[in-house]
């Protein structure tokens, strides 16, 4: 079994890949002060919850945008599983070409998302990841990662709204029944939802316009992707496991 570890700014998500199936996924909060022993305990407990033992793990692949946490988690894997994990990063084989100004600066999570989208759904494809930050990345029909957009995630934008104002409360980010808010809470929910969705749609249209009307697929992922998947015709597929599919593909290209 392959364990895929996605270390993000907000959460660490573990995927247990048993053959072509994802046998289980687990999420914990990203904390820089967790020790390698704490991460090791999380990992072994999640394995047991899915019916596995540490000895069932054949290998591990890590995708991280938080270097300090990646170091601790990597140490936990070496200690608890006796495995030196593969790490998604510069020099790793993906089968795609990265043609941006500084290829080494492309986030490991974006690279894995693109691999998952391109090899699962084909190109050309626009990959939108609704995480702590919101990213859009274009992959050509030849598998070339050539352009993208990075902007504020909806949670970060929402936190600024109630964090920087005296009388606006924290609200759940969800699809409202109507844009016609009638109290502070519903006005905020409508504003957050529809302005973010509108920005997503405009971004997709702008990509299409500047790419000469290219008929790319739009694949979304990330924790909040599900909220928007059925409210716009511009999104083709929401795939919550996209990064794990990409990591599995990358692993298969690099394993000895």
From Swiss-Prot:
Substrate binds at residues 107-110, 184. K(+) binds at residue 129. Homodimer. It is an enzyme of class 2 (transferase). Its EC number is 2.7.1.33. The active site is at 109 (proton acceptor). GO terms for molecular function: ATP binding; metal ion binding; pantothenate kinase activity. The lineage of its organism: Bacteria, Bacillati, Actinomycetota, Actinomycetes, Bifidobacteriales. It catalyses: (R)-pantothenate + ATP = (R)-4'-phosphopantothenate + ADP + H(+). It comes from Bifidobacterium longum (strain NCC 2705). Pathway: Cofactor biosynthesis; coenzyme A biosynthesis; CoA from (R)-pantothenate: step 1/5. GO terms for cellular component: cytoplasm. One of its GO terms (biological process) is coenzyme A biosynthetic process. It holds the Pfam family Pan_kinase. PANTHER family: TYPE III PANTOTHENATE KINASE. This is Type III pantothenate kinase. Keywords: ATP-binding, Coenzyme A biosynthesis, Cytoplasm, Kinase, Metal-binding, Nucleotide-binding, Potassium, Transferase. A monovalent cation. Ammonium or potassium. Belongs to the type III pantothenate kinase family.
